Amino acid sequence: MALERTFSIIKPDAVAKNVIGAIYNRFESAGLRIVASKMLHLSKEQAEGFYAEHSERPFFGALVEFMTSGPVMVQVLEGENAVLKNREIMGATNPAEALAGTLRADYAASIDENACHGSDAPESAAREIAYFFSDEEICPRTR
């Protein structure tokens, strides 16, 4: 088993539903440790930069608008196989296809407002973590 870090966003729809604590509980109950966290209201530029890989997709404008519509929580999670574990906790991108008990099944209303984001690979996790956090902001949890 590999100790990994992954990146997670609790999106504006889930923040508005006041389920941040419930989501953090899911992370911790699954063995993931929160090693960095902050609430932000993304600027248009931040959202466009973060989702740049989707800039040519038809949903890009709506995605940026949604991600800037209210505050988000960004966090770094650490644990054994953290990337895969977080993706399992989140569930399918489309909440209609997400398994019961996953974050998206429980808290998302649609594929467009789907409650959370999680890195899809260790490489994207490293890039996404660096986008929002400096090394000094990450607090390894040794106890």
Curated annotation (Swiss-Prot):
Superkingdom field: Bacteria
Enzyme Commission number(s) of this protein: 2.7.4.6
Any one GO molecular-function label of the UniProt entry: ATP binding
Gene Ontology annotations of biological process type: CTP biosynthetic process; GTP biosynthetic process; UTP biosynthetic process
Record InterPro entries: NDK-like_dom, NDK-like_dom_sf, Nucleoside_diP_kinase, Nucleoside_diP_kinase_AS
Listed PROSITE patterns: NDPK, NDPK_LIKE
Coiled coil regions in record: none
Pfam families for this protein: NDK
Active site feature: 117 (pros-phosphohistidine intermediate)
Key word Kinase present: yes
Catalysed conversion reaction: a 2'-deoxyribonucleoside 5'-diphosphate + ATP = a 2'-deoxyribonucleoside 5'-triphosphate + ADP; a ribonucleoside 5'-diphosphate + ATP = a ribonucleoside 5'-triphosphate + ADP
SMART domains: NDK
Subcellular localization(s) per the UniProt record: Cytoplasm
Cofactor(s) of this protein: Mg(2+)
Matching PANTHER family: NUCLEOSIDE DIPHOSPHATE KINASE, NUCLEOSIDE DIPHOSPHATE KINASE DDB_G0292928-RELATED
Described function: Major role in the synthesis of nucleoside triphosphates other than ATP. The ATP gamma phosphate is transferred to the NDP beta phosphate via a ping-pong mechanism, using a phosphorylated active-site intermediate.
Name this protein carries in UniProt: Nucleoside diphosphate kinase
Lineage: Bacteria, Pseudomonadati, Pseudomonadota, Gammaproteobacteria, Alteromonadales
